[in-house]
Each structure stands twice: as structure tokens, then as C-alpha cells.
Amino acid sequence: MIQHLALDALQRHLAGSPLYGWATSLPAQISARIEEGHGDLARWWSAVQRLPQVPAPKVDLAQRFALHSDHDAALQAQMKEALQGLIPWRKGPFDFFGVQVDTEWRSDWKWERVSPHVELRGKRVLDVGCGNGYYQWRMLGAGAESVVGVDPNWLFLCQFLAAKRYLPELPAWHLPLALEDLPEKLEGFDTVFSMGVLYHRRSPIDHLLALKDCLKRGGELVLETLVVEGDASTVLVPEDRYAQMRNVWFLPSVAALELWLRRAGFADARCVDVSLTSVEEQRSTEWMRFQSLPEFLDPQDRSRTVEGLPAPMRATLVARKP
């Protein structure tokens, strides 16, 4: 599997940059992770390998993720069967040669909210908690020079490799690592994204400091997370679950989040978007059949979760490393 991660191409791409030394260490680090494995990894990887060959597809990444080619119904059926072997699909949507992967999240809606506020042309980007790589492809569509994503989830890696199978030359890499697996003081990326990660961290300030370590001086952080209404002293800590999630720790107000960014050493922190998450944006589909946001909200009051807490509201902030 490791050869399909194209780590040699990543090393060539980063040659001469501050990230080259790190890139040379990745094969050994990731080989060790693959040795640890996962009980379903062989099944997921088999699904990727069953994807049919499609020469020279046409690609649209600027407006959506879409791959096109001349093909017959048999190829499309083979494509759908293989992609269904990678269910559940959380982030998307994807159009694989006419097979519409209707994911749990309408991640394209989030990208429409975030992308107008970020200049990616010619930038070297790190996407922390990149999931299946949907945003990585959209970042390339917005002009990024290259995008490295890190996420330790093996299913997400296989979903990324399903897309990479048809886009082998594009400068996007998915590493099955957590942010904590990256070296300290990496300081090699122009832009770092952390979207939908901060509220899962027991120590949010440490997360912000680790993100800053990945940035060049003058680089930009794009931070998207759950927030609540309130002033700079307002932070919600759920007693147990939040929207049925056990691993949610801190939901700050926007003002508190701006304060956290300043305390972590960022400058020019500003909020560029605040949006309530709708049941149209996150829901169960044919490609993600488990419960989703409609089941996590109070059926009598959609402004509250089933635990009686404020319904999900997400903010995007951008800040600069001085």
C-alpha cells in the first residue's frame, strides 16, 4: 500500500524546502503505522483496487469534485460497487464518472463559506484532520501549489486513494498520521487548515500552538470549529455528550476563540463566517446510513441538541503567525 501514498513524489516536491528532512523520514514512520494496521484495512484497500482504470479523465476541482470520461454502463456499475465498499462516506460530495457519492456532509457548502476569505494561489498547504481529502482537492482547485493532509483514519485514507487513483499527478498527499505525529517546529507551510478538529481536543490551546509550529513566519491559519453565543469569557464544556458525540470538550464563543488565538501567539485574528448547521447540510444518505444531525437535535426544538444544549453553530476564523 505504501507506494500508493506517493511519498517519493512528495520528497521530490519538497526538495530544497524546510520540509524536506521531514519528508525523508515519512516512509519509515508510515510503514510502522501500516504494520499496526486495522481490522478492516484489507477490505477497504481491496475496494480501492477494484476501481476500474479510466484513462485521461477530465477533472473539475474549482467548482466541485467531478471526474468525467467516455465510459459505458458496465464501467459505471463497477465504479459504484467499488466505491460502496468504502461506505460510510462523510465528506463530499464526489462525482466519480457519473457515480454521485452523496456524502453525509455537504462539504461544498462549507467550502463556499470559507474559500472567499483565503488566498491559496501558489501556497503550500497543510490540512489537519483532512478526513477523506475532499477539501484537499478543492484547495488545489483554488490554486494551491500543493496540499498535504494528515488524518490517522484508515477508511478516510482509502477514500482519498480512490480519488488519487485517477489524479496521480496532482500534488495532494494524505498521510495516515495525527498532528501529534509531526515534528515540533516544522515551520514549512504557508497556510494551515484545522476544520472540525478543535472541539475534539482536550487541550485546545496546545492544538493552536501545534498548528502555529507548522506555519512559516507570516503564514496563515484557517480555523473552523463549533462555537456558542457569548463574550470572551464564555466557553461551553458539555457534561457528557454533545449532539451524541462523547469526544467534544470545549465550545468557545467567537470572542473567546479570538482570545485563545492571541494567547497562542497569533496576530490579526478575525472571524469571517458564523453559520448554524442545518439538517440539509448534515444528514443520512445512501452513502452514510447511520444517524446524523436530524437525530441529534431535539425533535420539539431544533435550536437545541437532544442533550438540551445549543444546536451546532460553526465559525471560521483566520489568523496570522507573526
UniProtKB/Swiss-Prot annotation:
Homotetramer. It catalyses: carboxy-S-adenosyl-L-methionine + 5-hydroxyuridine(34) in tRNA = 5-carboxymethoxyuridine(34) in tRNA + S-adenosyl-L-homocysteine + H(+). InterPro entries: CmoB, Mo5U34_MeTrfas-like, SAM-dependent_MTases_sf. One of its GO terms (biological process) is tRNA wobble uridine modification. Catalyzes carboxymethyl transfer from carboxy-S-adenosyl-L-methionine (Cx-SAM) to 5-hydroxyuridine (ho5U) to form 5-carboxymethoxyuridine (cmo5U) at position 34 in tRNAs. Its EC number is 2.5.1.-. This is tRNA U34 carboxymethyltransferase. Gene3D superfamilies: Vaccinia Virus protein VP39. One of its GO terms (molecular function) is transferase activity, transferring alkyl or aryl (other than methyl) groups. Carboxy-S-adenosyl-L-methionine binds at residues 91, 105, 110, 129, 179-180, 195, 199, 314. Pfam families: Methyltransf_9 (PF08003). Keywords: Transferase, tRNA processing. Signal peptide: none annotated. It is an enzyme of class 2 (transferase). Belongs to the class I-like SAM-binding methyltransferase superfamily. CmoB family.
